[in-house]
Amino acid sequence: MLTNKEIRELLPHRYPFLLVDKVIELEPGKKVVAVKNVSANEPFFQGHFPEYPIMPGVLIVEALAQAAGIAVAVLEDNKGKLGVFAGIEAMKFKNQVMPGDVLTLEAEILVSKLGVTKAKVKASVDGKVAAEGEIKFAMTKA
């Protein structure tokens, strides 16, 4: 388990773009389960959509990427490196994420070589899948 402070030591993101609140399960280089508490005060709800607030799908993907990045960032070889997006594959959005939801972020590292990582990711609320697919990211020198 990682606290928010420990997450901030691994990821360069800060408010309002740090989208992982805590890590509840971590197998370095293999998998991660993390949580994003979706507050009614999130800045993106002001415009998406004021009368019917829904977390934008692209931010769900970003939250998944941040979670997956943590699984790799904790490895000694990646200390001080920055994870950057390299691709998204077969991402499907199945349910909406709304204020008050607890978004569970899961990532399983499928392969990681030559600085590029591919992960199977899933975001869910109360066991219902909100989004799932695969992402790729590269670890580069910051």
Curated annotation (Swiss-Prot):
InterPro entries: FabA_FabZ, FabZ, HotDog_dom_sf. GO terms for cellular component: cytoplasm; membrane. Keywords: Cytoplasm, Lipid A biosynthesis, Lipid biosynthesis, Lipid metabolism, Lyase. SUPFAM superfamilies: Thioesterase/thiol ester dehydrase-isomerase (SSF54637). It comes from the Bacteria. One of its GO terms (biological process) is lipid A biosynthetic process. It is an enzyme of class 4 (lyase). The keyword Signal does not apply. The active site is at 48. GO terms for molecular function: (3R)-hydroxyacyl-[acyl-carrier-protein] dehydratase activity. It catalyses: a (3R)-hydroxyacyl-[ACP] = a (2E)-enoyl-[ACP] + H2O. This is 3-hydroxyacyl-[acyl-carrier-protein] dehydratase FabZ. It comes from Ruminiclostridium cellulolyticum (strain ATCC 35319 / DSM 5812 / JCM 6584 / H10) (Clostridium cellulolyticum).
